[in-house]
């Protein structure tokens, strides 16, 4: 019996580690998607007469179309979409070289100052895509796709997709 247990323990341990890696990847991607969806949901909100574009979908140089999104909303309820400073109302997310990056106060998908949102040694982002469609009732609907893979084990990957109603957009 002891010999049988000794043979099965390494297999059980390996499976347990793999389940843990799947769970960590799933949780990391879901948390990231939740934050992006929150900003997409707020896009276009203004407590006054805001000027500018509330939504920009594009891509960084060398990346796929739709792999960068910049949204504006009136986070301070000042009636403006501030473009710079700690109260900036522009929030950007882009795919670049297998990493998802974010920046506040940004107006274009290229350029510097973007920060990686995840540890590149843990997670590689394979796909980030945002597209806008019309929902059943004619309102704007953002479709978000996010796919990532464990940097330590390429067999562990996860794809997420979801839709977000953007009520403040026409």
Question: Which ranges hold each PLM region?
Answer:
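Type IV pilin-like appendage domain
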Residues: 58-136
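Glycine-centered small-residue hotspots that permit tight backbone geometry or close packing
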Residues: 1, 44, 79-81
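Residue-level marker of positions within ordered structural domains that often coincide
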Residues: 10, 41, 76, 98, ...
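Aliphatic-rich helix starts adjacent to a transmembrane/signal segment
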Residues: 1-42
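Transition segment at domain starts
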Residues: 22, 32, 49-59, 64, ...
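Short linear sequence signals and composition-biased patches located at protein termini or domain-edge surfaces
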Residues: 114-170
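Sequence contexts marking disulfide-bonded cysteines in secreted/extracellular proteins
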Residues: 47-51, 67-69, 108-112, 160, ...
């Amino acid at each position: 019996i002891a010999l049988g247990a000794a043979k099965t323990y390494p297999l059980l341990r390996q499976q347990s580690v793999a389940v843990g890696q799947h769970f960590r990847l799933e949780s990391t991607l879901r948390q990231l998607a939740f934050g992006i969806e929150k900003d997409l949901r707020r896009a276009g909100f203004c407590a006054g007469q805001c000027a500018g574009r509330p939504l920009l979908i594009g891509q960084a140089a060398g990346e796929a179309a739709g792999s960068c999104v910049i949204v504006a909303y009136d986070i301070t309820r000042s009636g403006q979409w501030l473009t710079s400073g700690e109260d900036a109302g522009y929030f950007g997310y882009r795919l670049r070289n297998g990493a998802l990056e974010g920046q506040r106060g940004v107006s274009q998908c290229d350029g510097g100052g973007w920060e990686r949102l995840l540890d590149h040694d843990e997670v590689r982002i394979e796909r980030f895509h945002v597209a806008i469609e019309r929902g059943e009732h004619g309102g704007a609907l953002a479709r978000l796709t996010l796919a990532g893979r464990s940097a330590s084990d390429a067999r562990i990957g996860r794809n997420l997709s979801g839709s977000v109603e953007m009520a403040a957009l026409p």
